[in-house]
Structure formats: C-alpha cells, structure tokens
Amino acid sequence: MATMEDMNNMSGEITLPGFRFHPTEEELLDFYLKNMVVGKKLRYDVIGFLNIYQHDPWDLPGLAKVGEREWYFFVPRDKKHGSGGRPNRTTEKGFWKATGSDRKIVTLSDPKRIIGLRKTLVFYQGRAPRGCKTDWVMNEYRLPDNCKLPKEIVLCKIYRKATSLKVLEQRAALEEEREMKQMVGSPASPSSTDTMSFSSPQEEQNMPLPLLQHVLKKESETEDMVVPKQEKITNQLVLKDTNKSTCGTSLQMPFGKEKLPDLQLPMLSDWTQDTFWAQLNSPWLQNFTPTNILNFY
C-alpha cells in the first residue's frame, strides 16, 4: 500500500512544470500493462482504470489523470454475449470500429520477441453498421495470445487524428454544396398571383360540393380584387399622360378662361350662309320670273 509520502511524491512529480507523459509502445506493454495485470502497484499512478465504453470519446480527456493530446486508460474487456467472444465497444452515442488487422509490437533489443498486439479503432457516431466517422482514434494494447498472464485488462490510448487542410477544405465544400441543394430544393414562397387556383373540369367533377363552392368563391374574390387594381392602374396611366401633355405646351389660358367656348360653324344643311349661294339669293333674282322677263323685253 502506498504511503502518504509516496502519494505526495507522485503528486509533486506529475504537477511539475514541463512534465509530459509520452511513453513508447514498448513501455506501455512491457512495463505499465504487465505490472497492472500481475497486480503490482506502481509508485506513480499516471494511468487510471476506467471502462471507457460507458463514455463518449470527447468526455474522456476530462477523466484521464494526465495527458494533453493523448489520454491513457486501463480498460476491462467486456465480452459481447453470443458473438464469439468479441469485445463490446458500443457507447451511448456511437461505437468504436476496428480498422485493419492487429499489429505485432516487438522490443528494440530483440526484434523477434513479441511483447504485445496493437489494434487501431475509429469512433463512429450512430449505430452499426451505419454511422458517421469522426476523428477520434483509439490504440488498444493487449498482451500476446501466448502470454500466460491474464488478458482481461487492456491499455487504451485515446487521441484525435490531425486533420489536414485539404480534408478541411473538402468538408467545407461538401457542406456548402449540401446547403445549396437544400436551398434549391426548398419551394419558394408563393406570391398572391401564384396562389390563384385554376381547376380543370375533371378536377371540379371529382371535387366535393362544399369544397368546390369554397374554391369558386375564392376565385371570384380573387378576380374582384384583380379587376379594381387593373382599373386603378389604367386611370393612373391616363392621368400621367394628361399631365405630360399639359406640361409639354407653352400656352397658358387667361385666369378664369381655362375652357374655350365651342367654335360656331354653320350646319351642313344651312346653305344660306355660303357666299356663292347668297349672291344667287339676291332680291333681284327672286323677282326674275318668266313673266317679268317678257315684260322686260
């Protein structure tokens, strides 16, 4: 059991400025995991024991003992019932999916000596087999199959994969394209003239009587609204033309004489007003009869 002095030393070591925890894969397997499996207590408890599948990956950094960009946990292997002993890696909002086959980890001093296996998994939001891939990655380290030590505990390293600028640009382009499709696909708000209903005779026959009466009433109201509007526009155009003609002339009528009297012209049937016929209608010619002619001679 660790003494109070050991705990103080451990706390002081971890909180020292500049302290970073970046173990190699060989150190994780041959030192931390192996000592945890055999039950050997370490002086510095830098890796905590946690069932990470009860939490989503974005919650794990706050549950780790140390780490800034990488977080480490001892995790119990939870077997899924009736599936050949495959571990259950499902969380509340997603699941961890393995990518590729396991990779063998060897020591630097003896490349032929296998000290463990590494499995890489990626977190997907949703439910299997469908889901949305995220940038959360996990490296699961376990002891080799030929090891006689218990294998109910694994060591997991959680981190976020660095996203390149090209991938970010592709995501932004896809998001923009999806928004444009939604804008094009969404129906535009109809105007007042677009809402006018014109039903075919066949549709009117198939339409119930109350509904048909309602539609005809709506069409009649729409026509009554449109006709006065057209008459108003016509009157405005006539008034505008009148104003233009008035403003275009330079003649001004005297005050009180805005309206000229009508020009008096002789009627078409009044031939006495013509100068030629007035000469023929002289009094002398009126007395010019056959009797007067004989008396004249």
Curated annotation (Swiss-Prot):
Q: Where is the composition biased (Low complexity)?
A: 189-201
Q: Which residues bind DNA?
A: 115-167
Q: Taking every annotated instance into account, which residue ranges of this chain make up the domain NAC?
A: 15-161
Compartments, record wording: Nucleus
Keywords, alphabetical:
DNA-binding, Nucleus, Stress response, Transcription, Transcription regulation
Q: What induces it?
A: Induced by abscisic acid (ABA) and cycloheximide. Induced by tunicamycin, azetidine-2-carboxylate (AZC) and osmotic stress.
Tissue specificity:
Widely expressed.
Q: Report the GO molecular function annotations.
A: DNA binding
InterPro entries, sorted: NAC-dom (IPR003441), NAC_dom_sf (IPR036093)
Q: Which domain of life is it from?
A: Eukaryota
One Gene Ontology cellular component: nucleus
Gene3D superfamilies in alphabetical order: NAC domain
Looking at the record, which segments are called Disordered?
A: 178-204
The signal sequence is none
A GO BP entry is: regulation of DNA-templated transcription
Q: Its biological function? A: Involved in response to abiotic stresses and promotes cell death and hypersensitive-like responses. May act downstream of NRP-A and NRP-B in the endoplasmic reticulum (ER) stress and osmotic stress response that mediates cell death.
* Domains (record comment): The NAC domain includes a DNA binding domain and a dimerization domain.
The protein here is known as NAC domain-containing protein 6
* Organism name: Glycine max (Soybean)
Question: What is the taxonomic lineage of the source species?
Answer: Eukaryota, Viridiplantae, Streptophyta, Embryophyta, Tracheophyta
